[in-house]
A protein has these predicted regions:
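Bacterial Sec-dependent N-terminal signal peptides
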Residues: 1-28
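Carbohydrate-interacting/catalytic domains
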Residues: 19-22, 100-131, 182, 523-666
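Beta-strand/beta-sandwich contexts
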Residues: 21-55, 113-116
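Hydrophobic faces of well-ordered beta-strands that scaffold small-molecule active sites
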Residues: 133, 189-191, 243-245, 358, ...
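Substrate-binding/active-site clefts of carbohydrate-active enzymes
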Residues: 140-347, 352, 371-381, 391, ...
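Active-site-proximal helices and loops of the catalytic beta/alpha 8
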Residues: 251, 345-347, 351-474, 496-498, ...
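Active-site clefts of carbohydrate-active enzymes
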Residues: 476-496
Length: 666
């Protein structure tokens, strides 16, 4: 009996030993970035290595010429290791990294170092000469149906009848309509995020919008592949179109591997409530309680504490550390390893895909100082590149506080640090962010459309007053203006007022701003968010198989759609290369008699935007505008081709807009 007992114990010990060895077997399943580029101004490269037991390797070595292992960082999770390399003297090629455990065989990983396509200074971003066209890939056009259902992804379905589920648009659908953008006259395309969002549908909602990233180095396969994305950008460039990539540093998606296996305890903000013992938590929409009793921390969505010089700690914490929604964990940019990962990711997409700009989502929700470091590094590497930050507060003073105009001659260094001496609760110093979004313009214009322009504050007076604060901006010409986007009601709401829409667009495209359009405005798409955001993100007519209505072609548009398309297209093509708009001075006149006038001037050439801000006929009394008209007798309305005699008063129909072009005669 003792003999059998001994054998049984021996077998059990052997099984236990083998199981332990199996559990600790070293493996490398992923390295981020997937590859890298030599010749960067910053020679440091962070590799995030993921694999079973990888944290506890004894050494990481390489014999690749010009590469040095500077340090390795062991995180809380046994499945992550950060390797910091110096590539200062490296050349393109395949580098082999060896990960040696304390016991057992080392694991070797081949890693590609690539040649850059061009120097960073050769990459030119968007600016005031451009018109950005914002679209949602899932809602614009479908060029393939074989990517509608991807095996292995979390449960989802395509259903075009449901405004908050996926509809099946993709990169190929956009690529097939590149000529449409040229016909319209826009010069840059901004797609809402295209990276993988592997979140399950829940409660009739999905992450079709792209703002819950689960893989920072992979295009969502329902949109296409990385190769298809790069092809789309190359073909856009061949047609003179720039491409702006939407990024999110503030948060990731709940299904990102960082959530289930957090690299370190401080990788996320307010992670305490996440635990296996949490009960009753819906990963998409629910709340929960951690095993320690900690509660889910929700952001307040109030951005003012970030600039408030009197901000309380609790308010600032809720803004910057609270989660946007339960399905979007808040990233901790104060952790330098998190920020290095994100910075490198933005650089990787610039180098790999050749994007021409970045739109950074929820910019003030992230910690200001790490974000400023990102912008400083990006501006140094790409001095002519541009990034726009979403800064959603409708007061110009708030928006202007985020803009810092860097001096390219100083390698991206800020030349006006005194403009940001304190920056409220978030600390001081420049942001290095070149472009901000003009939510004041959006807000005031959408109020004015419902009002009569009186002698004081109503109607277009709101726009006039908003522009008065341009002195707060370091560079007003690098502020992005819009009348609607994917997060707002459509400008038309549930209506079809073409005259009002033309007035808004005439203003948008002639003031001292970078203008941004939203897909479908050119064919008068409307809708409100009253029920769901999906109702302002409807499918573009003709973009999907089986559509009976095709707004991509003149023949397929209704008469009203064609009239708006033709009017806007004419204005957009006129704006291209028009230096009066891109370089000229701007002068505005207080609305008088319900009429608002803005003049753009350059070397005698003048563009006069004239808006009747009332629902009744009005008169532009030319004598009031003598300083910008002079003795000019003849002006051309560029949208209609009609000529106006500026020696006489101009009669305007209700809500009429004119864009008059002339050479000023003294």
């Amino acid at each position: 009996m003792k003999k059998y007992l001994f054998l049984t114990l021996a077998l059990l010990m052997g099984i236990t030993t083998m199981t332990a060895e199996k559990k600790t077997k070293l493996s490398v399943s992923r390295v981020d970035p997937t590859d890298w580029y030599v010749g960067m101004k910053n020679p440091q490269l962070q590799l995030m290595v993921y694999g079973q037991g990888i944290r506890d390797v004894q050494t990481v070595t390489t014999d690749y010429a010009g590469v040095r292992v500077d340090s390795i960082v062991r995180l809380d999770s046994p499945n992550y290791l950060l390797v910091y390399l110096n590539l200062r003297d490296a050349r393109p090629g395949t580098m082999r990294l060896s990960f040696k455990p304390a016991k057992g065989k080392p694991v070797a990983v081949d890693y590609q170092l690539r040649q850059r396509a061009m120097a960073g200074s050769e990459r030119h971003g968007f600016d005031i000469s451009d018109v950005l066209y914002l679209l949602m890939p899932d809602r614009f056009a479908s060029g393939r149906t074989d990517n509608d259902q991807i095996a292995g992804m979390n449960a989802y379905r395509n259903d075009r009848s449901q405004p908050s589920l996926r509809h099946g648009g993709d990169m190929e659908g956009i690529r097939q309509h590149l000529d449409y953008f040229n016909e319209l006259g826009v010069t840059a395309l901004w797609f809402t995020p295209v990276l993988e969002n592997n979140s399950p549908d829940a409660g009739g909602f999905s992450t079709y919008h792209g703002y819950a990233t689960t893989d920072y180095y992979r295009v969502d396969p329902r949109f296409g592949t990385n190769e298809e994305y790069c092809l789309l950008i190359r073909e856009a460039h061949a047609r003179g179109l720039k491409v702006v990539m939407d990024m999110i540093f503030n948060h990731c998606g709940f299904e990102h591997p960082w959530v289930a296996d957090m690299p370190s305890k401080d990788w996320l903000n307010a992670p305490e409530w996440l635990s296996e013992k949490s009960s009753g938590r819906d990963p998409m929409t629910g709340f929960g309680e951690g095993s320690s009793g900690s509660k889910y921390l929700q952001t307040s969505y109030k951005l003012t504490p970030v600039v408030d010089p009197y901000a309380s700690d609790v308010d600032l914490k809720e803004t910057t550390e609270g989660w946007f929604v339960p399905s979007m964990p808040d990233l901790n940019q104060r952790n330098p390893h998190v920020m290095r990962y994100l910075i490198q990711n933005s650089i990787w997409w610039i180098e790999t895909a050749g994007i021409d700009g970045i739109r950074m989502d929820t910019y003030p929700y992230a910690f200001r100082e790490p974000m400023a470091q990102w912008m400083k590094e990006l501006n140094a590497e790409y001095p002519n590149f541009n990034t726009v930050g979403e800064t959603w507060v409708t007061e110009p003073a708030y928006t202007a506080a985020w803009q810092t105009s860097p001096d390219p001659s100083e390698g991206g260094e800020c030349h006006a640090e005194s403009r940001h001496p304190s920056f409220g609760g978030a600390g001081g110093g420049p942001t290095y962010l070149k472009t901000v979004m003009d939510f004041s313009f959006f807000d005031k214009l959408n109020q004015a459309k419902h009002e009569e322009t009186d002698g004081w504050w109503q109607g277009l007076n709101r726009i006039y007053n908003s522009f008065c604060y341009d002195y707060l901006y370091q560079n007003p010409a690098s502020v992005l203006a819009f009348i609607e986007n994917h997060d707002t009601d459509r400008f038309l709401a549930d209506g079809h007022d073409a005259t009002m829409l033309k007035q808004a667009l005439a203003l948008l495209l002639t003031v001292k701003r970078i203008p941004q359009l939203y897909y479908g405005t050119e064919v008068m798409m409307n809708g409100t968010k009253e029920v769901t955001d999906g109702n302002v993100r409807c499918d573009f007519p003709g973009g999907f198989p089986g559509d009976s209505h095709n707004a991509f072609t003149r023949q397929g548009r209704t008469e009203q759609e064609q009239q708006m398309f033709a009017w806007l297209s004419k204005l957009l093509h006129w704006r291209k290369g028009n230096e009066v708009i891109t370089r000229g001075t701007m002068k505005q006149f207080i609305p008088y008699g319900g009429v608002y006038v803005i003049a753009r001037q350059l070397g005698g050439r003048t563009v006069l935007t004239v808006l009747n801000g009332t629902s009744a006929p009005a008169t532009m009394q030319v004598v009031r505008y003598a300083e910008v008209i002079g003795a000019t007798a003849d002006a051309l309305d560029v949208t209609t081709g009609r000529r106006y005699d500026l020696t006489r008063d101009v009669e305007l129909e209700p809500r009429q807009s004119l864009v008059l072009e002339y050479v000023k005669v003294e």
